[in-house]
């Protein structure tokens, strides 16, 4: 890369993608139990009580899929960078807590939020992910050194003491109906002790940022984002049908200007739809997933089917086995690129999760002037 060049620029989820970070599966661990994580792991999950490194064969398979995905992007003229994995199978600590393991660096979308010429490191809300930003520092340093306009920012690191989490969430006896009621009432595992947010709870629509209030992002985190992005309008949204609301990109996915697919089990509430509808945007139900269950040892739901990566307003990457989602996007006029990734889902998510924007063509626009 040449010094003085504009390297970092991305204002939305659909402008032509030219430079991206794709995660790695090396050394990924199933994290040890901790307050935020216990609430996220479904009560009947085969991950309850397990922690430590994932098996070499599953890591190798996931890495092969991530490498293949990277090669698909490179062949389409997109520059791909990769993170530097840490030894995730080691104990970490701060003066407030200890964690038996870390997590991994397969999903950079969770950690890095690119808005214009700035890349922001999110606070994160899991103790096991507190040090994950280090995997991306070599890349961010390179961008900063070469791009005179690049801003590298980091949100205040949270203490993540027990005061950040509700103990009520830890019981195995809580049924799905009670969880859904809690979600409807916006009663989540995280308290309002300090600002918390994951980057994957934020969607970028030019001058507007749409942020999910849920397990991994609290209202103080959303307020911090409002203060930080002074030239943007920041909107809090929530999805009452999701008993485990974490990250917005398997629930609400912009495909191109004017069009969003929404998880039919987690519809955006009527009042919150006005921002989009008043400005001529269409919100349609996403197609059903092709699978009835997520892969083994996976945190995510079957709705990773809609966790797609838009390469430009006419082109989208969809997981190869998700035939219904591919068919829907094809009918909507998109060129669909099938990408095999299902065997890497357990390492941190789908095609959107495992990437983070560095550069998309385009400038800052106002897509919602009527507010």
Feature map (PLM): residue ranges:
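The feature marks the mature, well-folded catalytic cores of soluble enzymes
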Residues: 1-371
């Amino acid at each position: 890369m040449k010094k003085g060049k504009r390297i970092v620029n991305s204002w939305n989820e659909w402008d032509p993608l030219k430079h991206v970070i794709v995660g790695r599966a090396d050394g990924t661990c199933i994290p040890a139990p901790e307050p935020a994580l216990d609430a996220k792991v479904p009560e009947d999950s085969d991950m309850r009580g397990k922690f430590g490194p994932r098996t070499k064969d599953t890591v190798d398979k996931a890495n092969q899929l991530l490498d293949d995905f990277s090669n698909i992007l490179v062949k389409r003229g997109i520059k791909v960078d990769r993170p530097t994995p840490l030894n995730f199978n080691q104990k970490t600590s701060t003066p407030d807590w200890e964690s038996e393991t870390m997590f991994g660096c397969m999903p950079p979308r969770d950690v890095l939020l690119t808005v214009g010429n700035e890349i922001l490191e999110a606070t994160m809300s899991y103790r096991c992910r507190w040090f994950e930003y280090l995997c991306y520092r070599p890349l961010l340093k390179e961008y900063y050194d070469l791009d005179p306009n690049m801003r590298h920012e980091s949100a205040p690191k949270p203490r993540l003491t027990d005061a950040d989490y509700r103990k009520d969430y830890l019981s195995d006896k809580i049924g799905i109906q009670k969880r859904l009621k809690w979600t409807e009432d916006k009663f989540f595992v995280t308290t309002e002790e300090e600002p918390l947010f994951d980057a994957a709870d934020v969607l970028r629509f030019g001058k507007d940022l749409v942020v999910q209030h849920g397990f991994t992002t609290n209202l103080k985190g959303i307020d911090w984002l409002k203060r930080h992005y002074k030239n943007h309008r920041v909107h809090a949204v929530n999805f009452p049908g999701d008993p485990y609301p974490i990250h917005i990109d398997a629930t609400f996915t912009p495909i191109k200007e004017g069009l969003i697919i929404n998880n039919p089990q987690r519809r955006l509430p009527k009042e919150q739809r006005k921002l989009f509808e008043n400005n001529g945007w269409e919100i349609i139900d996403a197609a059903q997933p092709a699978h009835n269950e997520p892969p083994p040892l996976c945190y995510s739901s079957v709705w990773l089917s809609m966790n797609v990566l838009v390469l430009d307003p006419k082109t989208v990457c969809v997981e190869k086995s998700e035939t219904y989602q591919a068919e829907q996007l094809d009918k909507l006029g998109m060129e669909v690129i099938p990408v095999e990734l299902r065997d890497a889902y357990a390492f941190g998510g789908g095609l959107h999760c495992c990437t983070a924007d560095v550069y998309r063509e385009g400038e800052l626009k106002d897509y919602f002037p009527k507010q």
